Design a protein with these regions (language model features):
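Extreme N-terminal, non-catalytic leader segments
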Residues: 1-10
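Hydrophobic anchor at the beta1->P-loop junction of P-loop NTPases
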Residues: 14
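P-loop (Walker A) phosphate-binding loop of NTP-binding proteins
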Residues: 17
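ATP-binding Walker
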Residues: 20
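N-terminal phosphate/diphosphate-binding loop that engages ATP/GTP or pyrophosphate donors
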Residues: 23-108, 113-131
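Residue-level detector of conserved catalytic or cofactor/ligand-binding positions
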Residues: 132-138
Length: 138
């Protein structure tokens, strides 16, 4: 994200443990902002909610919640696809940038402060070992 490009729009972050009511609160916040003529969309920053079929164990937002407010990064990956902090950072930053460019307030919702911090701060994360090509000595 380009720093200070969208200084007039806030980025709201809701972080807390699984099943603590974050999704419901985020929907209420977005609906209230809409009433006040400030459109808002929810961006998932939870490392497990990105996976399809993990609804119960991750307290994935209900279909009703997802129909009430636009949600990004919910149930987008098959459970066989590895995810990482770097992938989530990239996908979520793209979603935040998209929202801000349309004048929409992004509401980040997740269980890990690390993931949310990686998205909103200037945090540089090295790739995982599985993504690094290691040369054999000759």
């Amino acid at each position: 994200m380009r720093k200070n490009e969208y200084v007039n729009l806030p980025v709201i972050c809701l972080v807390g443990p699984t099943a603590s009511g974050k999704s419901g609160l985020a929907v209420r916040v977005c609906r209230r902002l809409y009433v006040d003529e400030h459109p808002a969309e929810i961006i998932n920053t939870d490392s497990m909610v990105v996976y399809r079929g993990m609804d119960i164990g991750t307290a994935t937002p209900t279909l009703r919640e997802q129909r009430t407010v636009v949600h990004h990064l919910v149930s987008i990956l098959d459970v066989t696809v590895p995810s990482s902090l770097v992938l989530m950072q990239t996908l979520a930053r793209d979603a935040v940038e998209d929202c801000l460019s349309r004048g929409v307030i992004p509401v980040l919702v997740g269980g890990s402060a690390l993931y949310t911090k990686a998205i909103i701060d200037e945090m540089s994360i090295p790739p995982t070992l599985s993504l690094i090509h290691i040369s054999e000595p000759t």
